[in-house]
A protein has these predicted regions:
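Alpha-helical membrane-embedding segments
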Residues: 20, 77-83, 126-132, 154-163
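Juxtamembrane/interface motifs at transmembrane-helix termini
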Residues: 111-112, 139-140, 190-196
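Non-catalytic, topology-defining segments of multipass membrane proteins
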Residues: 1-96, 166-225
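Cytosolic juxtamembrane regulatory segments of multi-pass membrane proteins
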Residues: 127-145
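A generic hydrophobic-helix recognition signal that picks specific residues
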Residues: 61, 79, 106, 146, ...
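Histidine-centered catalytic micro-motifs
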Residues: 108-117, 148-164
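Transmembrane alpha-helical segments that form the membrane-embedded catalytic/substrate-channel core
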Residues: 22-37, 94-133
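Membrane-embedded alpha-helical segments that form the functional core of polytopic membrane enzymes
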Residues: 95-99, 144, 148-151
Length: 225
């Protein structure tokens, strides 16, 4: 909240976009950032101390180490690639596309679970299904829907019934809208506008004690003179 006050709306929004879209995914994998307090400071590549062990069941630790060997092998290939063909080749053909994939992962997670009028439920209010119905569907257009299997425009059904395959998601979403019109959430705002709106307005939450939920506070973007 303080950074919003000091930076002003535009700089704060750009800062949020950079932190979320560029640094957000690596920060989550390496330190569990934005993952909530349940698992503590977790690391997806190191399932033991000094990081929290709560993220991984004990039987998975061995699988994490095996996965790490695969990552080391891939990093070795990238070093060889850079030395043989130049770092520009590696960045443009591998690292750049990987960054784009990571950005889309964050966009979908951010946009479909966040909006100024969508609360986060407290413990006494939360249930799996109530939480799932707070997922938001948004319009991505035919091209992105084709490339991404409509995961953004049919995101709610992905949480309400995870076993629905992507090729039935549009039909399942139509049924969902017809059966639950009062609780199904859809925001028709174009994606780039929604992204900017959330980056500049979803700054901090406050507790609504009457109904045990967290709602977004109105941000103060007025810079100190």
């Amino acid at each position: 909240m303080e950074s919003s006050f000091f930076l002003g709306k535009t700089l704060y929004g750009l800062n949020q976009l950079f932190l979320h879209l560029i640094l957000g995914w690596p920060a989550y994998l390496l330190a569990g950032k934005t993952g909530g307090p349940r698992y503590g400071t977790s690391n997806h590549f190191w399932p033991t101390s000094p990081f929290s062990k709560k993220l991984w069941p004990s039987i998975w630790a061995k699988k994490v180490w095996i996965s790490d060997w695969g990552i080391i092998f891939m990093l070795s290939l990238l070093v060889f690639w850079s030395m043989k063909f130049g770092i520009y080749s590696m960045v443009s053909l591998y690292l750049g596309p990987l960054l784009v994939v990571n950005i889309w992962l964050v966009i979908y997670t951010w946009l479909h679970h966040t909006d100024t009028d969508v609360p986060h439920l407290g413990a006494s209010e939360f249930s799996y299904m109530r939480g799932a119905f707070l997922s938001i569907d948004r319009p991505y257009g035919k091209i992105l829907d084709f490339l991404h299997h409509s995961i953004g425009s049919t995101h709610a059904i992905h949480h309400i019934e995870p076993t629905v395959p992507h090729y039935h998601a549009r039909l399942a979403t139509r049924i969902l809208k017809n059966k639950f019109p009062k609780v199904y959430l859809y925001n028709p705002t174009p994606i780039y506008k929604s992204l900017w709106h959330i980056a500049t307005n979803c700054v901090a939450v406050k507790k609504d004690y009457e109904i045990d939920r967290y709602v977004w506070k109105q941000p103060n973007h007025n810079k100190i003179k």
